[in-house]
Amino acid sequence: MAETFLFTSESVNEGHPDKLCDQISDAVLDACLEQDPDSKVACETCTKTNMVMVFGEITTKANVDYEKIVRDTCRTIGFISDDVGLDADKCKVLVNIEQQSPDIAQGVHGHFTKRPEEVGAGDQGHMFGYATDETPELMPLTHVLATKLGSRLTEVRKNGTCAWLRPDGKTQVTIEYYNENGAMVPVRVHTVLISTQHDETVSNDQIAADLKEHVIKPVIPEKYLDEKTIFHLNPSGRFVIGGPHGDAGLTGRKIIIDTYGGWGAHGGGAFSGKDPTKVDRSGAYVVRQAAKSIVANGLARRCIVQVSYAIGVPEPLSVFVDSYGTGKIPDREILQIVKENFDFRPGMITINLDLKRGGNSRFLKTAAYGHFGRDDPDFTWEVVKPLKWEKPQA
């Protein structure tokens, strides 16, 4: 057997305080875009015991009831009493929203006068997109499994299968891989870790049994589990206090969970609460589409794409491609194909990926369980573009 290594990714589910904040910020974005597709939104959220605050810069024609959005989002997640960490109907809601800075507005969109191809990047920064052929989603298996475990925890809480569950929870998966000439091949699941909030009545034995039967079994393919797989199920022994009561929450604190679970790279910019002129979001979405399209079209088994911007400038400063040695043609040729097939100007990304369209909880859906690898028509950046290329003669 080839030499193997261990790699780990984590996830948190929708009741985690940081993820609660991401979801509120994106619910606000959805509400603004639904009424006014040209809304400029930079919405942050923070939370602690019995309090949620939304703050930031929003310029919109939309009539938005921020307090209602906060309470509805908290309620939908399951924060319906102080016992579970927050009471959606009784908590304090603070709102401190101002207009977008006129300095930024004139530089980016000329106070709404610029044509789409002339819209400048909303800020400087660099973003990465990643794809790998180890799963059908073209995402890392560690990240896919950690995310699906978190999603499944929420499912069995809401459908009553495990009535003792509460909204907050974290998951983590370690996988043994081998490196096949630059491509990642999963061998087995080494460790599964779940820490979930629970009510006072349930025993640790029942927690472990239910998690194995109702969460792990339906999510992790049997072929990856063996007698050596390690399970850490609520290893701290008690997790009754959770949500904002247990920990403060803040938008943009879970950027690796939102992306590739530690694989690839990250430029540092968060997604939630940002309209598409913010290249932290739109730039990261288009380079995911580029990386995914490279792998799906057979140009490489694994690949990373970087793009960078200057505030107020439409054209990217740089585009970079690395296929980790898995490319069927040289990386410089893959880069050329990427530049010919993808328009990295923010205004054009917005049009090509239809990013001004709110409603249908479109961006709210991205704010829990990952922005990438999702099978949902609203995730337009997951659509593979056909790329024309010629296989080199053998």
Curated annotation (Swiss-Prot):
It catalyses: L-methionine + ATP + H2O = S-adenosyl-L-methionine + phosphate + diphosphate. Mg(2+) binds at residue 10. Keywords: ATP-binding, Cobalt, Cytoplasm, Magnesium, Metal-binding, Nucleotide-binding, One-carbon metabolism, Potassium, Transferase. L-methionine binds at residues 57, 100, 247, 278. Its cofactor is Mn(2+); Mg(2+); Co(2+); K(+). Binds 2 divalent ions per subunit. The metal ions interact primarily with the substrate. Can utilize magnesium, manganese or cobalt (in vitro). ATP binds at residues 16, 168-170, 236-239, 247, 253-254, 270, 274, 278. Its main location: cytoplasm. Its EC number is 2.5.1.6. Pathway: Amino-acid biosynthesis; S-adenosyl-L-methionine biosynthesis; S-adenosyl-L-methionine from L-methionine: step 1/1. Pfam families: S-AdoMet_synt_C (PF02773), S-AdoMet_synt_M (PF02772), S-AdoMet_synt_N (PF00438). The keyword Cell cycle does not apply. GO terms for cellular component: cytoplasm. Gene3D superfamilies: 3.30.300.10. K(+) binds at residue 44. The keyword ATP-binding applies. It is found in: Cytoplasm. PANTHER family: S-ADENOSYLMETHIONINE SYNTHETASE (PTHR11964). Belongs to the AdoMet synthase family. Homotetramer. This is S-adenosylmethionine synthase.
